[in-house]
Amino acid sequence: MTARPLSELVEQGWAAALEPVVDQVAEMGRFLRAEIAAGRRYLPAGHSVLRAFTYPFDNVRVLIVGQDPYPTPGHAVGLSFSVAPDVRPLPRSLANVFDEYTADLGYPLPVCGDLTPWAQRGVLLLNRVLTVRPSNPASHRGKGWEVITECAIRALAARSEPMVAILWGRDAATLKPLLTVDNCVVIESPHPSPLSASRGFFGSRPFSRTNEILVGMGAGPINWRLP
């Protein structure tokens, strides 16, 4: 991640929303550059670390929280759960998300795991921790990203616009207190990982429920359909 002003790295609405933690963002940039200097790589690529914040802040209607990036080289792209279009096979959690997507909405399975269309349509795909060492899950937890991503979530919750937060798993559920506001409805279920998907993720209908809630709050529904 390059040493540039935050306003050059993220969308302007997000630059304002993250102003309270601008020093922390700079500190995380220094941390990542120190990792590289020490011969340690990180994922995703530097230009994708803040990718979730490059889509308009004012357009966000849905928040989907992940834990940290995929630790498999070539998988992490800066959006929670998403992978590059050429990744095969899909990560098992994402495959389970797609199975529920098909069961919930009746759409065919997407041709690839790229969730960019969702991000472009107002879905913030945000990991709580934005980087990871390759093949070392959770290796960057507690380094400082949580302060930044929680600031982002607080900024969303402080708006007046309707929003739905989809929290999958216990880790994401700890954010619920930040989202307990009049303009936000929280949908909770177990995580789509193979260890927990059969305990309540399958059948939870997060996509159709989200749209029902948004319409009920006077907002437009999300077009969830993927190629």
UniProtKB/Swiss-Prot annotation:
Pfam families: UDG (PF03167). Its EC number is 3.2.2.27. Keywords: Cytoplasm, DNA damage, DNA repair, Hydrolase. It catalyses: Hydrolyzes single-stranded DNA or mismatched double-stranded DNA and polynucleotides, releasing free uracil. One of its GO terms (biological process) is base-excision repair, AP site formation via deaminated base removal. The active site is at D68. It is an enzyme of class 3 (hydrolase). Its main location: cytoplasm. Gene3D superfamilies: Uracil-DNA glycosylase-like domain (3.40.470.10). SUPFAM superfamilies: Uracil-DNA glycosylase-like. InterPro entries: UDG_fam1 (IPR002043), Ura-DNA_Glyclase_AS (IPR018085), Uracil-DNA_glycosylase-like (IPR005122), Uracil-DNA_glycosylase-like_sf (IPR036895). It is found in: Cytoplasm. GO terms for cellular component: cytoplasm. GO terms for molecular function: uracil DNA N-glycosylase activity. PROSITE patterns: U_DNA_GLYCOSYLASE (PS00130). It comes from the Bacteria. The keyword Cell membrane does not apply. The keyword DNA damage applies. Belongs to the uracil-DNA glycosylase (UDG) superfamily. UNG family. Excises uracil residues from the DNA which can arise as a result of misincorporation of dUMP residues by DNA polymerase or due to deamination of cytosine. This is Uracil-DNA glycosylase. The gene is ung.
